[in-house]
Amino acid sequence: MPRQFPKLNISEVDEQVRLLAEKVFAKVLREEDSKDALSLFTVPEDCPIGQKEAKERELQKELAEQKSVETAKRKKSFKMIRSQSLSLQMPPQQDWKGPPAASPAMSPTTPVVTGATSLPTPAPYAMPEFQRVTISGDYCAGITLEDYEQAAKSLAKALMIREKYARLAYHRFPRITSQYLGHPRADTAPPEEGLPDFHPPPLPQEDPYCLDDAPPNLDYLVHMQGGILFVYDNKKMLEHQEPHSLPYPDLETYTVDMSHILALITDGPTKTYCHRRLNFLESKFSLHEMLNEMSEFKELKSNPHRDFYNVRKVDTHIHAAACMNQKHLLRFIKHTYQTEPDRTVAEKRGRKITLRQVFDGLHMDPYDLTVDSLDVHAGRQTFHRFDKFNSKYNPVGASELRDLYLKTENYLGGEYFARMVKEVARELEESKYQYSEPRLSIYGRSPEEWPNLAYWFIQHKVYSPNMRWIIQVPRIYDIFRSKKLLPNFGKMLENIFLPLFKATINPQDHRELHLFLKYVTGFDSVDDESKHSDHMFSDKSPNPDVWTSEQNPPYSYYLYYMYANIMVLNNLRRERGLSTFLFRPHCGEAGSITHLVSAFLTADNISHGLLLKKSPVLQYLYYLAQIPIAMSPLSNNSLFLEYSKNPLREFLHKGLHVSLSTDDPMQFHYTKEALMEEYAIAAQVWKLSTCDLCEIARNSVLQSGLSHQEKQKFLGQNYYKEGPEGNDIRKTNVAQIRMAFRYETLCNELSFLSDAMKSEEITALTN
């Protein structure tokens, strides 16, 4: 059956939900001050009057419930369901026999979903004994039954919306969450079905630059409508507007779904419920750590050959133009000046310029340069000044040196930049255990950017087994429009995505781009999130082909149209047996909380995510959906948030899927191994244990664009399975106790949602 995008109508949205969503957007647009704009979504930390009034309201609700016969019946039915859930989540304890022996009874329990015909078989994995924390009672949320059921059902609906968008774009969605939501294929589909398709690395005897394996051309036609590229089998189909059978997104449906999430994050009972659950998760981890820290440490000590230094780590968020540290850049500049000062490196007004003349024009001698005079490091002056931070990409404040050393398109064809990237790659290969995912820019000014970038990659032989590439699209349409480089926003989207569709449909005609795309694993959306936009994105927003103003579209507008085209492209590439792409935008570093709502629907994973701390509902949803978050505390420390206030440790303890990344080593780091610098500082400041560090490292590999074969090699054959069954301690150095705790805790939280849905069914049957 062909995959289709399920459409909804705006009239199907509850009027109250729609008005609330519009109120949220209007609030964000009206108030530039971030604290005021976030007031709708935050739970006040210190407001005695507000807390007292809230407690009074809760008490009145509790007293009213005690007198209600109907509520008593519902409580009784829910108590039965909850008792069953708790008994299933607590496997019996036995002596640990060690990793080689299988003991099914010791495995964390797989969920029993509504409508399941039989109990799922527990994972055949041995588990060491450890101390568990459980809470029993009528309902464990600490709020009234009515509020609990309302919150749980709303959260379940939000997760179902997320699952719909993830599956349509071949993004990842946790199988365990899908099981609890009652997805019909969750029990029958093979565990590896939901994995993204990344091209495996070439074998040692294979040429990574071979152009002869392109599949045959299909000669489909591609036409943009409303900012989205549609594929047609032939000219006749195009004339009749009958596109190829692929899922094409619908803006009205997206607006409906976004309205539900926006209304949810402002709902009082849901905010209270999520706030309590998040506090519980953090407290539960503290208790787990207190009770089982030594048991975890004993597990790691008995694990031969593996420690923190020789587990694989991936830098999941790093920009190629700043992937080297400042000393590396300085050394390279001096080396090129000493070895080839008379080489022609630029052309200005028809006059060729040598490297010596470039520095003479800047009135400087490279011999006298220091890391301080190079001035590429971010400091105190860049805090909350993204404009000053961007200027740090210009060595010595000279854009000429940036164009010469840090660009792929210049007189030398990006040779110097390629050489530096290859030096960084060589250091990664020597370290053996470190990988990175550098971002390369595509601006959308011209469709020639793609073939030029592919040529740069092949011409300078930039491939490295320790690197996977991500394409970042800066949100700077307003700059190009003001310079008359683009007629409308639709043209920018066409320049970004049309070459990819052509290379997918007719790879024989675009061999270089087809080859380059094998090593590209995702797309990123980048720029200063704190920029204010006066436009409220909705189904009434102008189409990209009529967005001709010099005003930049809002963040949500960018994300929807990038996701829409990536979704269609992924389905086309999957049909052809080619690799697919993940959407991994910068999100939640600054700006509006609505950015995180857009990413919840459209992104596979995000970078930064700091603003999740401001919204308990979104933070809890990101936890339940296990959305990967690449965090860069040293980068944030120089730009938006002091290191001590960074929520990474808090997110890790609660169980969010976080990894450590460097962002821009040139601006923020001092050592040659920037990623190890991140881990070392985090470990010292937050007193992270070895198990914590290895868990973060394992998360980074899971989040990354490394292929299925590589992840099996680095994490274990069953890495895609959830819980201890998917963990091979011999490769990850993550204690099975920790994996069991994470899995059982997630199952427990998800069971609250499924129990609420079951209680509704039982109540309906008894009435």
Curated annotation (Swiss-Prot):
Cofactor binding summary note: Binds 1 zinc ion per subunit.
Active-site residue list: H608
Pfam families: AMP_deaminase
Pathway named in the protein's UniProt entry: Purine metabolism; IMP biosynthesis via salvage pathway; IMP from AMP: step 1/1
EC number per UniProt: 3.5.4.6
Keyword Phosphoprotein annotated: yes
The entry's keywords: Disease variant, Hydrolase, Metal-binding, Nucleotide metabolism, Phosphoprotein, Zinc
Cofactor: Zn(2+)
InterPro entries per the UniProt record, alphabetical: A/AMP_deam_AS, AMPD, Metal_Hydrolase
Residues recorded as bearing Phosphoserine in the entry: S85, S107
Entry's Gene Ontology BP terms: AMP catabolic process; AMP metabolic process; IMP biosynthetic process; IMP salvage
Binding, Zn(2+): H317, H319, H586, D663
PANTHER family: AMP DEAMINASE, AMP DEAMINASE 3
Matches recorded under NCBIfam families: AMP_deaminase (TIGR01429)
Disease: Adenosine monophosphate deaminase deficiency erythrocyte type: A metabolic disorder due to lack of activity of the erythrocyte isoform of AMP deaminase. It is a clinically asymptomatic condition characterized by a 50% increase in steady-state levels of ATP in affected cells. Individuals with complete deficiency of erythrocyte AMP deaminase are healthy and have no hematologic disorders.
Function summary: AMP deaminase plays a critical role in energy metabolism.
Protein name: AMP deaminase 3
Gene: AMPD3
